[in-house]
A protein has these predicted regions:
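Intrinsic-disorder/low-complexity regions
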Residues: 119, 131-132
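A short, amphipathic alpha-helical segment
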Residues: 58, 126-129
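A short, acidic, flexible beta-alpha connecting loop/helix-capping segment that sits on the rim
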Residues: 129, 140-145
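M16 family metallopeptidases and their MPP-like homologs
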Residues: 6, 10-115, 133-141
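Low-complexity, intrinsically disordered Gly/Pro/Thr-rich segments
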Residues: 118-126
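His/Glu-based metal-binding/catalytic segments typifying zinc-dependent metallopeptidases
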Residues: 1-3
Length: 147
């Protein structure tokens, strides 16, 4: 999604310097997934750009990512994984997870990443979008009072 929004929002529309997409999963207190898409823009462009965000999410849920994007994403994930292994926080987080859940996230990571297909991403996003569970937050700076 970062690649798509960089092309659409930043390069094509000139609407923002960058768009940040992030996701998180949690098990407790209940299982949930959060997908956040955050960007700053001119207030006059917020409606148009918000529409593009939803349009591109729906497109990805229907068509999936391109082969080029999949390759770039996998390369990035594997690089971040190798870099993370040099950090104590990576190992502490994984030890903590293993202690509490018994799940070893360090095992077979590269194999898992390489096994993900564009169809997997498309189907996952399609299921997510079918939930119709969206919250849109728009924050603006109040206009200065006329003096």
């Amino acid at each position: 999604l970062d690649l798509v929004y960089t092309a659409e929002i930043r390069e094509k529309e000139g609407g923002s310097y960058g768009v940040n997409c992030s996701g998180s999963l949690s098990r407790y207190p209940k299982e949930q997934l959060v997908l956040q898409i955050v960007f700053q823009t001119d207030p006059a462009k917020k409606d148009k750009l918000s529409g593009i965000v939803i349009e591109q999410l729906n497109k990805m849920a229907k068509e999936g990512p391109s082969a080029e994007h999949m390759q770039k994403i996998k390369e990035y994930m594997l690089k971040k994984y190798k870099d993370a292994q040099k950090e104590n926080s990576y190992w502490l987080g994984n030890l903590d997870e293993y202690f509490y859940t018994g799940i070893d996230y360090t095992k077979d990571y590269e194999t898992l990443v390489n096994s993900i297909t564009a169809k997997d991403v498309q189907e996952f996003l399609a299921k997510l979008m079918k939930q119709n569970n969206e919250i849109q937050v728009i924050m603006t700076v109040p206009e200065e009072e006329a003096k």
